[in-house]
């Protein structure tokens, strides 16, 4: 599991995928979401889904955990 540190208390799913270098842009994000992404074990298809401290994202064989910094 890889921790992704964010500023503030929220990040959107699409932004997280870019920050983690899983997606390069909008087209990549769309393809990844179509292949299947889990947020806290539940399927998610919305790139705008809000993620908060402790949320877990499973995408393209990687597991990410959101860690909020202040």
Regions found by a protein language model. Give the residues of each.
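A detector for short, charged/polar N-terminal pre-domain segments
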Residues: 1-11
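A basic, amphipathic helix-loop patch mediating RNA/tRNA/ribosome contacts
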Residues: 11-52
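Short, Lys/Arg- and Gly-enriched loop/turn segments at beta-strand edges
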Residues: 64-70
């Amino acid at each position: 599991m890889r921790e992704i540190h964010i500023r503030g208390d929220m990040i959107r799913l699409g932004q997280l995928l870019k920050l983690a270098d899983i997606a390069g842009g909008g087209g990549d994000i769309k393809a990844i979401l179509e292949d299947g992404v889990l947020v806290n074990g539940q399927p998610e298809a919305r790139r705008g889904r809000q993620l908060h401290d402790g949320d877990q994202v499973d995408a393209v064989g990687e597991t990410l955990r959101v860690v909020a910094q202040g």
